[in-house]
Amino acid sequence: KQSMLTRNNILFSERVFTSELGRTQGDVMFMPSPLNHATGFFHGLISPLLLGGRAVLQQDFRPREAIELMNAEGVTWSMSATPFIYDMLNVLDAEDGLAFDTLRLFCCGGAPLPPALIERAARYGVLLCEIYGSTESCPHVFVPPEKCAEWNGAWSGVPFAGIEVKVIDEAGNEVPRGAQGEEISRGPHMFVGYLNERDRTDRALDDEGWFYSGDLCYMDGEGRIRINGRKKEVIIRGGENISAREIDDDLIGAPGLANSATIGMPDARLGERICTFVVPSDPAAPPTQDDLIAYLRERHVAKRLWPERIEIIDEIPVTATGKVK
């Protein structure tokens, strides 16, 4: 899917993003994410341009070199997925004398922040700030820097100024505070639709401008939001959304495979990795992970969609309506 955003969408989003995070012309941004990704383009290019500041880019992310580069360039803040800061903290833990000389704020998107990671970063003088959003609804929820230590991963944040967020039930009604429902948002930052996909656009974006994220959350009396699940069958691997159903569809026809069900398995570095449960055609000769990868490679399926672990099972449990339990 290709999300369409206007110039005004992007400019509003980045102006409120930099303002609420207290960024100024004197700040130096480090961007390890690819510039063809929303994170890299919005925050690595547009934000520094609007501030009149500097951006430091790294062609291929290598944690030790990244730390040295940031120190040499006086980097003060960064924005990327959790694995980037996770890897750099591992380097700092392993090497005496190496530190973040100037980095003070690292914004993390793509997945909730574990409290233990926030505490590790704080020991090196860095605030980890959780950011929530998507390409369609650019970052629109954040933890204010002054609240990072206090909230310590308990909340995904509050909406940026000028952006509305609601939590609704299956019927589209707003739920009481503290009750779980689907997160929806609207504002000047919102995309205008998917390129050449009218039906998909209509499912995601209603006539009043609300975007239906498919993410589950709850909101407290102060308007703080906690993302705590997903309606959609999505695996968040290193900040990238991967469709579990797409992986199972790609595996259809693989030799020795009768059925499969893919889920995200917890991972300390990436948040989740791809785990596929496999029902073999012949229990005496189940396919291996290498067999499945070879099949996907032959079909030119992107490597990011390859199972990273498989589990052989007798059958996949389903509900009365045929949905995987």
Regions flagged by a language model, labelled:
Residues 11-28, 36-77, 91:
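Conserved AMP-binding/adenylation subdomain of ANL enzymes
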Residues 50, 72-80, 89-151, 164:
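Gly/Ser/Thr-rich phosphate-binding loop
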Residues 158-162, 173-204, 240-242:
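Conserved ATP/PPi-binding loop(s) of AMP-dependent carboxylate-activating enzymes
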Residues 70, 78, 187, 192-193, ...:
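AMP-binding/adenylate-forming catalytic core of the ANL superfamily
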